[in-house]
Swiss-Prot record, chains A, B:
The gene is DTD1. One of its GO terms (cellular component) is cytoplasm. This is D-aminoacyl-tRNA deacylase. One of its GO terms (molecular function) is tRNA binding. It comes from Kluyveromyces lactis (strain ATCC 8585 / CBS 2359 / DSM 70799 / NBRC 1267 / NRRL Y-1140 / WM37) (Yeast). Pfam families: Tyr_Deacylase. It catalyses: glycyl-tRNA(Ala) + H2O = tRNA(Ala) + glycine + H(+); a D-aminoacyl-tRNA + H2O = a tRNA + a D-alpha-amino acid + H(+).
Length: 150, 150
């Protein structure tokens, strides 16, 4: 399982012409589920995201506070392309990306764990499998890669 | 060296209140340089980005055309946080991230290779080391992680 976390001041997902979800300050998460991922991968990375100290303290010292300590929100979007292998050739190889119902099930469990930790109203979702336009403002920028196998 | 590529319909970098760079359709690249990276890593990933078939063909089949074949642009931003190790604890460990002049030099060489391949006017940059607001619209979304050590 891989996650690209971007620290945002705002982020939204639009499908067609409808804004389906939006947050103010917090994390935009792009989430890739792999063919060999299980509940323990979901467990590991949901804990990691909720406890990750991605925010400064009041004195401006970095990496001090986590998402709930700054009353932040999370916008989560499923992104199988994160599991691409790119070392050979010019086309991405997606054999390690879990797809369809299996991916959606694990992704749903990941969302449930984030909501359990942060509160339902603080965790937004894209539309699994839809063509989405993800608008965001990455402040810093701050972008962190999490990998459950690392 | 790590790159997070996001396929965008627009992207810009603002420092303070000034928009310092912006592109329309193409790639937003967040680029992390590691302490053990050399020119060969720069060479490898610049070739990979320029030849990567991230775009559909006219019939809508995916992964067929590269950035120059679709007359796309690249907005590149230095992002040392991509080299963070996150497996232990709740704070990112940046010991593997190259910093300062050494990072800036390799990053500059990476930019030069992209420009040589795509044309100077098609490759934009952030401001190395500055606090930047990176606005983007990731279409799909499509996000790919490239790692020169993979």
């Amino acid at each position: 399982m891989r996650i690209v976390l971007q620290k945002v001041s705002e982020a939204s997902v639009t499908v067609g012409s409808a804004v389906v979800s939006q947050i103010k300050h917090g994390y935009m998460l792009l989430v890739g589920i792999g063919t060999d991922d299980k509940l323990e991968d979901i467990d590991k990375l949901s804990k990691k995201i909720l406890t990750f100290r991605g925010f400064d303290d009041d004195a401006g010292y970095g990496w001090k506070r986590n998402i709930s300590e700054v009353d932040g929100e999370i916008l989560c979007v499923s992104q199988f392309t994160l599991m691409a292998r790119t070392s050979k050739g010019t086309k991405p190889d997606f054999h390690l990306a879990q797809r369809g119902e299996l991916a959606n099930e694990l992704y749903g469990q990941f969302m449930d764990k984030l909501k359990a930790g942060l509160g339902d109203d603080k965790v937004q979702n894209g539309v699994f499998g839809a063509m989405m336009s993800c608008k965001l403002t990455n402040e810093g920028p701050v972008t962190i890669i999490f990998d459950s196998k690392a």
